[in-house]
Amino acid sequence: MAVPREPDQVVRLFLDLMERRQLPEAQALLAPDFAMTFPGNVSPPSLDALVEWAKNRYRFVRKTYEHVEVCGTDHEHAVVYCSGTLSGEWLDQTPFEGIRFIDRFELRSGLIRRQSVWNDMALHTIPQP
């Protein structure tokens, strides 16, 4: 897998790989000290743990990007913000769409060091199977 040089392209590749559940390839884009935080102060210790946590929330989720912004211009350190909406399917196979999200990524030396996630998913009723 060719790793992009531009911070926004690294982030988009990571998110695309995560959506397809290509975890080893996604892991290759992460710094050794990578940390992630999701709504409710959930901080899964690994990508595998994130997927396990998500299994209790929805069957799948996709992102539609409205904005991707890069702060910082050098490749040593950059912050990338992605915002848009989530769509997918709840556990009972009911579709959802239009749920707002913002992801903030910190990159150092071309690798993702931190991901912080905010979304409005909690404002929507999550049907149970």
Residue spans of the language-model regions?
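Hydrophobic pocket/interface hotspot
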Residues: 14, 26-27, 34, 50, ...
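Short beta-strand edge/turn micro-motifs at domain boundaries
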Residues: 100-128
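Short, surface-exposed coil-to-beta transition loops
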Residues: 63-67, 96-102
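A structural preference for long, well-packed, hydrophobic secondary-structure segments
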Residues: 54-57, 84-98, 117-124
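A short hydrophobic beta-strand element
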Residues: 76-86
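Short, low-complexity N-terminal intrinsically disordered segments enriched in polar/charged residues
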Residues: 1-32, 128-129
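A solvent-exposed, acidic/Ser-Thr-rich amphipathic alpha-helical stretch
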Residues: 23-75
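Flexible loop/coil segments at beta-strand boundaries within sensory signal-transduction domains
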Residues: 74, 91, 108-109
